[in-house]
A protein has these predicted regions:
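Bacterial Sec-dependent N-terminal signal peptides
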Residues: 1-25, 117
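Extracellular, repeat-based ectodomains that mediate carbohydrate processing or recognition
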Residues: 20-402
């Protein structure tokens, strides 16, 4: 049976939640993960899968009102290796554009893979375009990201053999100009090719374009190097300069954070980048108030095993660490950066790159931080393992969140 992924968009107009919810401890599931998983940039779809719903009733969240529309269909289900990219924008007039990695083939080669695009003028959800049949690009691509650019335009970035961008001056209509190559880095130890991009724009008329990306180079069958980069355009995407990401200032750009484990947001002249997804490093946020010319670092979550070598016996711990898996970032109109992290439990019970992840209703949740805070997220009892812990033992058994 061919698997089809239906991409739908919901606009949340109301939300209410109760304060406490009791869950039995048996809901927790354990998984073994290898931190050195190779990501190659031409990831294969997972193939045919059947999903069986297991309905439950929960008082935690109730949607009061929501507009929803199906905007595209794809048989390619691997939309990210970690974070979801900037796949949607809403312009000042309410218009919404959505992109996704799209294919209509049911095989593993997905030669038609590329960017599917749909557009809704002025935010009227009854007036979405027809579901796309063909990709925007002329070649096989993946991992699209989109943003407004200029007075009324839009810019699309995706990866093939490196990164390219496509631009049009009027959002939602007209021909795309491209591909315009975003240069791969020069002077690096290995010949890295940029992939897995996230794009955002800032400045007057959104003409300054910021792209964060990762790259991976295979050294031999057992070793590879990954590195984080930042590309910037000051003319709406026509010309580019690529350099190391702001992580470079702390010597953390290489072999620390994973590809696809980063996010970017802009508002006015403010730019913020989030890096997480590493059990060997802190969760870091870099903020610029001058459109990406200079950066300041903030630690969102302090990893008690920051910088540890997996082969070091001191990296072994059986006392659960509540740590981040993925994250999201936004900047409000006052320039405040908001960070959300989803939380899992981790144990590294033996030397080596494998660790155990516990996820389930007694572990999952969302931790929040913003840069008005003067310190990273901390536990009230001072236990660094529990700084992101959201569920506590409840009287009478189970876990309580509230």
């Amino acid at each position: 049976m061919k698997k089809t992924l239906l991409i739908s968009l919901g606009l949340v107009l109301g939300l209410s939640a109760t304060a406490q919810y009791r869950i039995p401890q048996t809901e927790l599931k354990a998984y073994t993960v290898n931190s050195k998983k190779e990501i190659v940039g031409d990831e294969k779809a997972t193939g045919t899968m059947n999903y069986v719903a297991n309905p439950t009733q929960s008082p935690v969240i109730r949607w009061e009102s929501m507009n929803e529309a199906a905007v595209m269909m794809t048989t390619y289900d691997l939309q990210s290796n970690a974070y979801v990219s900037n796949r949607m924008y809403q312009a000042g007039d309410g218009s919404v554009a959505v992109v996704a990695t799209m294919s209509h083939e049911s095989n593993q080669t997905v030669n038609d893979r590329g960017t599917g695009y749909n557009f809704c003028q002025n935010g009227d959800f009854s007036k979405w375009g027809n579901m796309p049949e063909n990709r925007i690009e002329s070649m096989k691509t993946g991992w699209p990201t989109i943003a407004t650019v200029g007075a009324n335009g839009e810019i699309l970035v995706s990866h093939a053999d490196g990164l390219n961008c496509w631009i049009r001056t009027t959002k939602g209509e007209g021909e795309w100009e491209g591909p315009i190559a975003i240069p791969n880095p020069e002077g690096t130890q290995y010949p890295y090719k940029l992939s897995w991009a996230r794009a955002a724009t800032s400045g007057t008329d959104n003409n300054i374009v910021h792209v964060i990306s990762g790259a991976q180079h295979k050294i031999d069958n057992d070793h590879y190097s990954r590195c984080m980069f930042y590309s910037r355009s000051t003319d709406g995407g026509q010309t580019w300069i690529t350099d190391y990401s702001p992580l470079r200032s702390d010597s953390l750009e290489t072999d620390v954070y994973s590809n696809d484990s980063y996010a970017i947001a802009t508002n006015g002249n403010n730019v913020a980048i989030l890096y997480t997804g590493s059990l060997q490093a802190h969760v870091l946020m870099y903020k610029s108030t001058d459109n990406g010319q200079t950066w300041q670092k903030r630690i969102v979550w302090e990893n008690p095993y920051n910088g540890i070598d997996w082969d070091d016996p001191q990296s072994v711990y059986t006392d659960t660490v509540y740590g981040p898996a993925n994250g999201a970032i936004a900047i409000d109109n006052n320039g405040v950066v908001h960070v959300a992290l989803n939380v899992y439990e981790y144990i590294h019970s033996e030397v080596g790159t494998s660790y155990t992840v516990f996820r389930g209703l007694t572990s999952d949740g969302i931790a929040y931080w913003n840069d008005t805070e003067t310190t990273p997220i901390t536990d009230a009892d001072g236990n660094p393992h529990d700084a992101l812990r959201l569920w506590k033992p409840a009287a009478g058994g189970g876990s309580m969140h509230g």
